């Protein structure tokens, strides 16, 4: 839907890369000045994710997770490393990944890969991941690239694996953001793109207790 709003895909991606290169490699930088919401976000994500993890029929394993648009590793440090044996990070900004190695501290030894790559070009290793976590980054992909990326993520899942998309949700339609060269989609648009990727939404909920002035944030569990 938003592809008609994007006149030049090349500049759409290059301008986003340029924006993030000027962002300080801090939690506050990763959250656009809203570093204070990090704990609320992580706690909500942990409750969401733990509904699916465990042993037995239909449960998602805890071997390896992928953090997409990982930045300095905020989600890896506080959500994924406490729950998974190993984690991979992928982000388009090398400076953030370099910072992640120190930000993660001693636990960085359980990070197996730091991939510097835009998600439109990233190819997850087949059947490697129990969980692929995609937060606050899908707005940097065009519709077609998001669908293609989700399809590649599906092939990167282990049996009973899970894709989680957690992101801002517009009230209606698609809203472009010229500051960071991204878009914000409403739920109907997002649901259609998920279906195009051949995935099903098995659970969805809205993040609670965020400031009123920011977009609603929804988490979707996909298989």
From Swiss-Prot:
S-adenosyl-L-methionine binds at residues 69, 74, 91-93, 119-120, 135. SUPFAM superfamilies: S-adenosyl-L-methionine-dependent methyltransferases. Its EC number is 2.1.1.244. GO terms for molecular function: histone methyltransferase activity; N-terminal protein N-methyltransferase activity; protein methyltransferase activity. GO terms for cellular component: cytoplasm; nucleus. It catalyses: N-terminal L-alanyl-L-prolyl-L-lysyl-[protein] + 3 S-adenosyl-L-methionine = N-terminal N,N,N-trimethyl-L-alanyl-L-prolyl-L-lysyl-[protein] + 3 S-adenosyl-L-homocysteine + 3 H(+); N-terminal L-seryl-L-prolyl-L-lysyl-[protein] + 3 S-adenosyl-L-methionine = N-terminal N,N,N-trimethyl-L-seryl-L-prolyl-L-lysyl-[protein] + 3 S-adenosyl-L-homocysteine + 3 H(+); N-terminal L-prolyl-L-prolyl-L-lysyl-[protein] + 2 S-adenosyl-L-methionine = N-terminal N,N-dimethyl-L-prolyl-L-prolyl-L-lysyl-[protein] + 2 S-adenosyl-L-homocysteine + 2 H(+). It comes from the Eukaryota. Keywords: Methyltransferase, Nucleus, S-adenosyl-L-methionine, Transferase. Pfam families: Methyltransf_PK. One of its GO terms (biological process) is N-terminal peptidyl-glycine methylation. CDD domains: AdoMet_MTases (cd02440). It is found in: Nucleus. Distributive alpha-N-methyltransferase that methylates the N-terminus of target proteins containing the N-terminal motif [Ala/Gly/Pro/Ser]-Pro-Lys when the initiator Met is cleaved. Specifically catalyzes mono-, di- or tri-methylation of the exposed alpha-amino group of the Ala, Gly or Ser residue in the [Ala/Gly/Ser]-Pro-Lys motif and mono- or di-methylation of Pro in the Pro-Pro-Lys motif. Required during mitosis for normal bipolar spindle formation and chromosome segregation via its action on target proteins. Belongs to the methyltransferase superfamily. NTM1 family. This is N-terminal Xaa-Pro-Lys N-methyltransferase 1. It comes from Danio rerio. The gene is ntmt1.
